[in-house]
Amino acid sequence: MADKTPGGSQKASSKTRSSDVHSSGSSDAHMDASGPSDSDMPSRTRPKSPRKHNYRNESARESLCDSPHQNLSRPLLENKLKAFSIGKMSTAKRTLSKKEQEELKKKEDEKAAAEIYEEFLAAFEGSDGNKVKTFVRGGVVNAAKEEHETDEKRGKIYKPSSRFADQKNPPNQSSNERPPSLLVIETKKPPLKKGEKEKKKSNLELFKEELKQIQEERDERHKTKGRLSRFEPPQSDSDGQRRSMDAPSRRNRSSGVLDDYAPGSHDVGDPSTTNLYLGNINPQMNEEMLCQEFGRFGPLASVKIMWPRTDEERARERNCGFVAFMNRRDAERALKNLNGKMIMSFEMKLGWGKAVPIPPHPIYIPPSMMEHTLPPPPSGLPFNAQPRERLKNPNAPMLPPPKNKEDFEKTLSQAIVKVVIPTERNLLALIHRMIEFVVREGPMFEAMIMNREINNPMFRFLFENQTPAHVYYRWKLYSILQGDSPTKWRTEDFRMFKNGSFWRPPPLNPYLHGMSEEQETEAFVEEPSKKGALKEEQRDKLEEILRGLTPRKNDIGDAMVFCLNNAEAAEEIVDCITESLSILKTPLPKKIARLYLVSDVLYNSSAKVANASYYRKFFETKLCQIFSDLNATYRTIQGHLQSENFKQRVMTCFRAWEDWAIYPEPFLIKLQNIFLGLVNIIEEKETEDVPDDLDGAPIEEELDGAPLEDVDGIPIDATPIDDLDGVPIKSLDDDLDGVPLDATEDSKKNEPIFKVAPSKWEAVDESELEAQAVTTSKWELFDQHEESEEEENQNQEEESEDEEDTQSSKSEEHHLYSNPIKEEMTESKFSKYSEMSEEKRAKLREIELKVMKFQDELESGKRPKKPGQSFQEQVEHYRDKLLQREKEKELERERERDKKDKEKLESRSKDKKEKDECTPTRKERKRRHSTSPSPSRSSSGRRVKSPSPKSERSERSERSHKESSRSRSSHKDSPRDVSKKAKRSPSGSRTPKRSRRSRSRSPKKSGKKSRSQSRSPHRSHKKSKKNKH
């Protein structure tokens, strides 16, 4: 048994090694080598000593690897193959191939090398095999036993193990036994044993201490970086660790997580957060646009848009992001004013996000706050001191330089040195570092740095005393030497030098206090003025695009996209393009390119882009001017071929517009005529206005149409005398007097005045048109009672006689009364009516222009919309109000005109009465003339005694005709005044009335009067025959 035990142990150990070779990295043998058991100790003691002391001998290592394994591997493989084989085995499978042998040998070499490496580590670490083997320090190769015991208690540093060390861990090893993933340094040095002297520190220990110091400095920097602001005290380690755990970077997130679930996208109820979450951002919006939109409310700490990275996020067609303000107050105002507002056609959805670290300096400062952080302009005084007057008003002119030293010292003592914190972080850190060493080392250090860094531009602030950086450096150094804290200082003005200027320290981070009320009002007042207009940079970009536009597809496409993206300012863009096309000196290719731009914008005006339809509306008002300017350019072209090419390109645009149906065909034909020079813009406007002023043909029909037929077709005695006068005289009376009669107005209202479709403007002039269409005069009504009495006395003979004589005398009457008097009256009435209608049309055009302007302002939002009314109802209400106002003015003018006419009539009637009283013998002369015997009337006794009323009427008509001819010859320019005087004569005779009828176009009455004397025998003969019967 004694012989078997060593051999058996040796055999078992060899089997263990051979199995380790085939087990791909098991660490059981490794554990046996480092920590042997009691049963194996006698058999393992012999090979361990030479392996430990002669590990550098290559031949010994090869013998150690090769000697026991090759002999044992073959019988083991054969036994395994025999145990699991079915049937006969081939001889080829019993022997390993050359490649397998090489791989097996390579594995054995790696295994042996790993064991030797572990034993090498164990020589310095200790014999405890359960712990991880790492480097601690160097030592002697053949160390004594006491030294090994001491090494076990020394501090340990984790070092990443080799790739073989991971394979030697057993599979059932717990995760707690694995080495930590962070660099941990034991700060306390383990105590030495009694009686052992302290050794001299090796290079490895010195390197370890240096690593400790670097790690401490790194931890300190992380603590400083984790603060919310440099003006707050440093936080504890637990706070910094919690912040680092709460705010993982976006880089560590999985790419599959949507942006909506990003850190900060949900309100956690933090009352101090200044971070706003934006949930609905236009994909075309970038960080710069967000800064300009949100920066109006205060300085911004950070702006971030979460750009889509996956197809799913791009399909949403909206982005999200975060905007962090420097203080809570500004963030609350931004949330209140921008939540739900439309920005670039997207409704802004805002909410609170998680707090983010606030940097010392904001990334965006509003222009209203920028002046507080900008340094003052150079003044020429030491340290760039500013006089008090110029500090209040930077635009004030510079004061003249002092003439003597006393004035200079006085100015300098009253000046103020304004300290501004530099915005460049590198320069600010260098200044702070310089101040730290100057305070510690003294002014000699500053002198040495100035001598050494005289050519370094970073240290220029030490030499240039008037720069803002030097002013800040000098103040900060003085403040630290006076006992101020680096984060808090006194803000009162003070004198640094005796009889020197006042120094004004910067405020304690003004960005953390928010914008003042004045700056808030300035930021909000600027917004309405820029509504619907381009910004300065956008206007400059548009002008630059138009200047460099060429007839290329890409250039025109880019310009069209710019126009559609800024469709809110469509009116300004259309004006700018129209102005660019009006310049005659512009080269023809640029003109064609700008016309193509107009065509592209009009084509895309029906696209689903916000406010794109405005271009069709605004271009419609400018296209006439555009093509008029193109016509001027076309006429200035000298070459025939070049002009034809230009013409063909323009006509191509017309054909395309006709296919697109952008505008109606009559409008396109009009534009084409303007371009070809067939129609001028001014003449086109005049021709458009004339038909509206005349309102068609009713005026001519009223003058020349129905009234003549009414007069010719009805017998004289069967119709009222008022109908015999016709339209012109009545219209003249109405033009003169302005007082229409109620009876005639009612009768005329039932007649159709217009024979074409009436326009909406005819409702305004309806009363005046009816008054002008009245065919009777108010003077006829005064004499109507007398005429009715005369007509009752007429007998049946006169009626039949008149009927027979009417047909025979038509031709004579037509020739007799087709005199220039009628034409003159017609022309005068027509001219006056056209003048009146022209004046009224001009007023109506002004009203319509006001209505159009009101509608444009209502649509663009400049005028508020009344609740409960649509746009059309509000426009109609405005038009009715203007028309009512104009009608009231017209009524006032009519009253004044009537008043003046009445005064003139009264004065003329008085004159006429005095004239009639002076001539009382006219009636007697008339009676004598009427009772004189005639050959025909002597045969009838009745006619001699009672003179005929018709003869009297004929005589009166002749006398009145002579008087009217005399008065007309004396007053040729005013025929209406003559007729008015004759009609308004208060004398007993009806001479004025007869004179008026003599000039009328009634052929029956005048014919009867002309025959009253010449055909008296014939008439008396007929009357006598009827009396006999």
UniProtKB/Swiss-Prot annotation:
Residues 55-64, 97-111, 144-155, 186-222, 239-249, 810-841, 874-922, 950-980 have a biased composition (Basic and acidic residues). SUPFAM superfamilies: ENTH/VHS domain, RNA-binding domain, RBD, Surp module (SWAP domain). Residues 7-16, 169-178 have a biased composition (Polar residues). Pfam families: CID, cwf21, RRM_1, Surp. It comes from the Eukaryota. The keyword Amino-acid biosynthesis does not apply. Residues 45-54, 991-1029 have a biased composition (Basic residues). Residues 786-806 have a biased composition (Acidic residues). GO terms for cellular component: nucleoplasm; nucleus; U2 snRNP. Its main location: nucleus. The modification N-acetylalanine is found at residue 2. The modification Phosphoserine is found at residues 67, 202, 236, 485, 788, 800, 811, 946, 948. GO terms for biological process: RNA processing. Residues 1-111, 141-274, 778-841, 855-1029 are annotated as: Disordered. The modification N6-acetyllysine is found at residue 760. The modification Phosphothreonine is found at residues 719, 931. Residues 274-355 form the RRM domain. It is found in: Nucleus. Residues 92-121, 192-232, 837-915 form a coiled coil. Residues 534-679 form the CID domain. There is a cross-link at residues 80, 145, 168, 208, 748-749, 760, 822, 829, 832 (Glycyl lysine isopeptide (Lys-Gly) (interchain with G-Cter in SUMO2)). The keyword Acetylation applies. Belongs to the splicing factor SR family. Interacts with ERBB4. This is U2 snRNP-associated SURP motif-containing protein. It comes from Homo sapiens.
